[in-house]
Amino acid sequence: MLKVDRKIIVSMHPIIEADEFYWDRGVWDKDLFGLLQKAAAIILPQTVERELYYLCKKVCPQVFPNYDLRFLWEGKIGDTLAFWTYGVKHPHTLVFPRVETLLGDHSQMDHPVPELLQYPFVMKGAHAGEGRQVWLIENETELEEKLQTLLHLELEGIRGFVIQEYLPALDKDLRVVVVGDQVHSYWRKAPTFLHNVVQGGEIDSASDKELQEVGREKVWEFCRRSGINLAAFDLVFPAADDEPFFLEINYTFGRTGLGGSERFYTLLHDAVNQWLQANL
């Protein structure tokens, strides 16, 4: 690769100003490639495509945010692989790359039908989000119904799901948001299975401060080891357990619990500026 004089900062994030701006949803061409080669640092939006992220990583020494883990192991299956790898506490989880993994008795592959968790259990599509494709399965009829949904998704090229241990009697989960070196937290409360704000969950930033601090510390330790610097984590504290279970990692997430979009953009600006000062 030719040596280049890296003097500019390139932003593809519409609210982050830099020497050069390039819309990530615009045409990717040789001019873009040349621009990225000249960059000392690149700032990307949360919606960046995997291929563009890796192009930026290939040609530029400094890229924010760090999505290495996100694109190495994507979706809910990827979350499970990350939790296994970094040894964090999480509900017992089975990964199914396809529906036939659960249904098929493939003797020639030495693969019997796997033994499932006891009902009720949680089933999540590989690319579930905001409570969509997340189901509490209480019996075989419900399982068969959701497997049909997953089969239809496979026809669209969306494969894989997880079955996860159900942790009962939980009326809230802890959302921990990492923005650069900043860590914020709040509870999401709901009497139903799903606690997502978009699904009707209520935000509570004030209660159980000690548990919130524990959750923030656990997430920060995970991020320190994995390199994540922009994501939201969902944790729960089962009864009589002061150590949280990790449920999910969300690289795009709602901002209501942080105080809305304007507050999030302020946090993001601060995080980017601190990152630039530390890395350039």
Q: Where are the language model's segments positioned?
A:
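Conserved N-proximal alpha/beta basic substrate-recognition cap immediately N-terminal to
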Residues: 2-103
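Short glycine-enriched loops at secondary-structure junctions
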Residues: 47-50, 69, 182-183, 191, ...
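Short glycine/proline- and charge-enriched loop/turn segments
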Residues: 60-65, 195-204, 248-254
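Active-site nucleotide/adenylate-binding loops and adjacent lid/helix of ATP-dependent enzymes
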Residues: 70-161, 213, 280
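Protein kinase-like catalytic core scaffold
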Residues: 121, 162, 184, 231, ...
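Phosphate-binding site of ATP-dependent enzymes
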Residues: 132-222
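Short, surface-exposed charged micro-motifs
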Residues: 175, 234-236
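C-terminal active-site "lid" helix and adjoining low-complexity regulatory extension at the edge
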Residues: 210, 224, 228, 237-280
